[in-house]
Amino acid sequence: MVKIGIIGTGMLGEAVGLHLLDSGYSVSVYNRTKSKTKNLEEKGADVAELPSVVAESSDLIITCVKDADAVKQVLFGQGGVVSGKHDDMTVADMSTINPNAAKEISKKLHDEGIKSIEIPVMGGPNVAIDGKLVLMASGDKESFERFSK
């Protein structure tokens, strides 16, 4: 089964994580404020100390953080996803960022050999926990097909 990592467990990231756990997925999580991972940990998620640790154990990493700077930090900063990368890993960004930043981040991931999908969403935590978010995905077609099942 696919192993999923979630970086950013605020209201939306937590709701997505809870839905994935309820659906039987193996989930690991990271959040700067560790207390925001408590509900997910209680439901069975593994809590990582760094984004790189999430990357090491995940096939798909979902970022759900506050802005483009935060996305860049968790991906490319010290202890970021890139330092834990492995073959056949995909990053799916659900953060609310502008299209130019999304393109820049996608290019940097590609340069690192990491596949990426940008996934702006419509709907909030209540919709996410029920698995009914509206997703507008773009990016690596092979990864989209692999993880949309």
Where are the predicted features?
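Rossmann-fold NAD(P) dinucleotide-binding segment
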Residues: 51-64, 68-115
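A short acidic, helix-capping loop that chelates divalent metal ions and anchors anionic groups
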Residues: 37, 71, 126-130
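Rossmann-fold dinucleotide-binding core
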Residues: 4, 97-149
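Hydrophobic alpha-helical segments typical of transmembrane helices
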Residues: 16, 36, 50, 70, ...
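Alpha-helix N-cap/helix-start capping motif
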Residues: 10, 34, 65-68, 99, ...
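A short local structural element in Rossmann-fold oxidoreductases
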Residues: 17, 41, 72-76, 148
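NAD(P)+-binding Rossmann beta1-loop-alpha1 motif at the extreme N-terminus of oxidoreductases
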Residues: 1-56, 60-63, 89, 94, ...
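Short low-complexity, flexible loop/linker segments enriched in glycine and/or proline
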Residues: 42-45, 62-64, 109, 131-135
